[in-house]
Amino acid sequence: MEIWKPNVTVAAVVEQDGRFLVVEEETDDGLRFNQPAGHLEKGEALVAAAAREALEETAHHFWPEFLVGIYQWPKPGSDITYLRFAFGGRVDGCEPERKLDDGIVRAVWLSLDELRATRERHRSPLILQCVEDYIAGRRFSLDLLRHYDA
């Protein structure tokens, strides 16, 4: 019997001056907006994964400060389910000459109104949900998470 496993992902929710850091990326469905996000790598702590993905996709140094939420999303039309850990925090420093991950067209700062107006171009409904949860004040201590080295 095969054991089903979700795709574990991390995302960075970053607000600065009323705007949110997102990426525009190439997907099978065309250009889409997403938070800086990606898959957890073997042996990696969730918090470290969020910082790494943000740097790779935006060239910004992201410092996770709290957990916004954990989101389970079965992708329509597939047998894939994502388990997303969304982290809030701050960016401190940028490497403008850094090459962004393959498929990332650009990093951009969008207002909440702009995010809502472009929802049909979001990679998933999790993008807006994470931002709205952040705005609603959802903050969970990183102490909630425990990472054990092998």
Predicted region positions:
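Conserved N-terminal beta-strand and adjoining loop/helix that marks the start
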Residues: 1-21
